[in-house]
Curated annotation (Swiss-Prot):
Its EC number is 1.8.4.11. This is Peptide methionine sulfoxide reductase. GO terms for biological process: cellular response to oxidative stress. It comes from the Eukaryota. Residues 1-20, 168-191 are annotated as: Disordered. It catalyses: L-methionyl-[protein] + [thioredoxin]-disulfide + H2O = L-methionyl-(S)-S-oxide-[protein] + [thioredoxin]-dithiol; [thioredoxin]-disulfide + L-methionine + H2O = L-methionine (S)-S-oxide + [thioredoxin]-dithiol. The keyword Oxidoreductase applies. Belongs to the MsrA Met sulfoxide reductase family. Keywords: Oxidoreductase. InterPro entries: Met_Sox_Rdtase_MsrA_dom, Met_Sox_Rdtase_MsrA_sf, MsrA_MetSO_reductase.
Amino acid sequence: MASSTTNNPALDLDSDTPENPGHELAQFASGCFWGSELRFQRVVGVIKTEVGYSQGHVHDPNYRLVCSGTTNHSEVVRVQFDPQVCPYSDLLSVFWSRHDPTTLNRQGGDVGTQYRSGIYYYNEEQDCLAKKSKEAKQKEFKDKRVVTEILPAKRFYRAEEYHQQYLEKGGGNGNKQSAQKGCNDPIKCYG
């Protein structure tokens, strides 16, 4: 990671790079990161997923601190993908299908700023595609405003290990869910 360009490293742009130079990174916030991650794990062309925290103002946050509502972090899924196999527009389609983008700071029973809807881009092309997709989604919601924020991807803080691939590993009750590419089984979130 490059040295901080501000007095607060949490406010820096995410300067991590994909493991393969032909791959790209993307960050999405759409409520609890467990179900969101599993949905992205199933996408052909997604190489790796990690859950974590981004867009906040506290350096090196943890789950408990983020859930306190004092850090302004989003729960995010950072996706490493091969754009030759999975265009960014496909990831945007997965993002929009996974949550209600008209609810501010909540998804279902999960309430708090960490559950907000957000697309955090790494380059101008992602920014442009994200904005176009939001405009298209807004047309579907005639009477509701899409509240999804679209911002540059700030520093990514990887969540604690037990959150990584949580539903694939069985979640809180041991019922493993498939992360197989192309799987369309319903995603059941549980702690």
